[in-house]
Amino acid sequence: MSESRIDFRKAEFLISAPDIAHLNEYLPGDVGVEIAFAGRSNAGKSSALNLLTEQKIARTSKTPGRTQLINVFKLDKHRRLVDLPGYGFAQVPLALKLKWQQALGEYLLKRDCLSGVVVLMDIRHPLKDLDMQMIEWAVESHIPVLALLTKADKLGQSDRMKMVNEVRKKLSNFDDAVKVEPFSSLKGIGKSKVLSILDGWCKPEWLMQQIEADAIAAAQAEAGKE
């Protein structure tokens, strides 16, 4: 069964939750497909979500660490985007910082419907310890990762590709589990490439088969009414 490209502009706010335990209370079970966005508090995560959905769906802040909640956005009845709390911020109490990092780890390791994780990193300062931890958690759970090097407009074309290649080399031990792409919310660099990757993550074979089966069942039920 074929399906047209997912329209990420249709994303709409669903719920907010302080941690994965509360998230499970609100979501309709661990079902469907979720794509998570994670990154350091200054990596430009909210700006990236706003560009990809072409709306101000995620709140941006000049204060690192302000986004403390897990925010969930619905694409359709089968698919969701999940904006995870920023990590690595300095002006936050250690206990709260550790609590958030634990919640991120639990989400990545326990959420079966996760179809992909976008780890956003400032292209000028990639692969910090917590970035690597996020990537390793996802790979450990057999979840594909897109390492998105944000603020790519801050570098010239030559330096930009040099950094992309360096990061790809450092992550090469993960084989095909991790893709690396440059991105700029300001200039739109990498937008179409990212949307293509996300579109693929939204269409795992099992979900496409389920959608087809549901369509057939609905058609048969409708025919039975005639």
UniProtKB/Swiss-Prot annotation:
Sites where the protein binds Mg(2+): S46, T67
One record GO biological process: division septum assembly
GO molecular function: GTP binding; metal ion binding
Keyword terms of this UniProt record: Cell cycle, Cell division, GTP-binding, Magnesium, Metal-binding, Nucleotide-binding, Septation
Pfam families: MMR_HSR1
Primary role: Necessary for normal cell division and for the maintenance of normal septation.
Protein name, per record: Probable GTP-binding protein EngB
Natural source organism: Shewanella halifaxensis (strain HAW-EB4)
